[in-house]
Amino acid sequence: MTDQQNTVADDESAPQFSLQRIYVRDLSFEAPKSPAIFRQQWEPSVGLDLNTRQTALEADFHEVVLTLSVTVKNGDEVAFIAEVQQAGIFLIKNLDEASMSHTLGAFCPNILFPYAREALDSLVTRGSFPALMLAPVNFDALYAQELQRLQSAGENTVQ
């Protein structure tokens, strides 16, 4: 009986991660030069802005929002601008501060990215433009770069 009680106590203090919900928080599309843009030779240049933010909700629940903003130009003219805010609610318990930061800053965005990419691609094709095939993003590398940038900024302010 004692072994079972210890197992239950250990399980309660063990790290826990659970995806509760994935949803589109915001979605927008603009094609300012349509329909004239459709008659031009298509030579696009794609600009991608990526951002994440985290919000602590009630007890152990966190919202992570991944924002992808794409601006596609054909020559010097903007063909379209598309943006999606893909969000998720995650239950995260019993992690130390560094693990929690990594989970919210890299692991959760990795989960959200395929959903955001699909939402953008669907939006773009519904606007009658060619499919937008975004390459995978290495959120672990981006997270490491951000940590390094913050550490460097902290060292510069101390000096």
Curated annotation (Swiss-Prot):
Its main localization is cytoplasm
- GO CC terms of this entry: cytoplasm
Q: Which GO terms describe its biological process?
A: protein folding; protein tetramerization; protein transport
Task: Please name the source species.
Answer: Pseudomonas fluorescens (strain ATCC BAA-477 / NRRL B-23932 / Pf-5)
Q: Which GO terms describe its molecular function?
A: unfolded protein binding
Keyword check for Transport, yes or no: yes
SUPFAM superfamilies referenced in this protein's UniProt entry, alphabetically: SecB-like
Question: Is-annotated flag, keyword ATP-binding?
Answer: no
Job description of the protein: One of the proteins required for the normal export of preproteins out of the cell cytoplasm. It is a molecular chaperone that binds to a subset of precursor proteins, maintaining them in a translocation-competent state. It also specifically binds to its receptor SecA.
Description of how the protein assembles with itself and partners: Homotetramer, a dimer of dimers. One homotetramer interacts with 1 SecA dimer.
Localization (cell): Cytoplasm
Keywords of this entry: Chaperone, Cytoplasm, Protein transport, Translocation, Transport
> Pfam families, per this entry?
SecB
The protein's name in its UniProt record: Protein-export protein SecB
Which family does the record assign? Belongs to the SecB family.
Q: List the disulfide bonds.
A: none
